[in-house]
Amino acid sequence: MSQVTVGENEGIESALRRFKRSVAKAGIFSDLRRIRHHETPVEKYKSKLKQRSRNRRR
């Protein structure tokens, strides 16, 4: 779970931006999409290929 503490002089907008960035970095939305929708075997294979190419770029 992502958690962001808001500083005294920090605005809500910047804290929200930091929270969204941490959620994206943790991969929470991609997990939700995967869990909520059924994937056919072909879609699973394609998503694994995409993930491998993303990891190779890093």
UniProtKB/Swiss-Prot annotation:
- Please give the PROSITE patterns that the UniProt record associates with this protein: RIBOSOMAL_S21 (PS01181)
Q: Name one GO cellular component term.
A: ribonucleoprotein complex
Q: Which keywords does this Swiss-Prot/TrEMBL entry list?
A: Ribonucleoprotein, Ribosomal protein
Q: Which InterPro entries match?
A: Ribosomal_bS21, Ribosomal_bS21_CS, Ribosomal_bS21_sf
Q: Which domain of life is it from?
A: Bacteria
State whether keyword Ion transport applies.
no
In the record, biological process GO terms are: translation
Gene3D superfamilies named in the record: Ribosomal protein S8
Task: Read off the Pfam families from this record.
Answer: Ribosomal_S21
Q: Name one GO molecular function term.
A: structural constituent of ribosome
**Family membership noted in the UniProt record:** Belongs to the bacterial ribosomal protein bS21 family.
PANTHER family, per this entry?
MITOCHONDRIAL 28S RIBOSOMAL PROTEIN S21 (PTHR21109), SMALL RIBOSOMAL SUBUNIT PROTEIN BS21M (PTHR21109:SF0)
Identify this protein by name: Small ribosomal subunit protein bS21
Q: Which organism is it from?
A: Parasynechococcus marenigrum (strain WH8102)
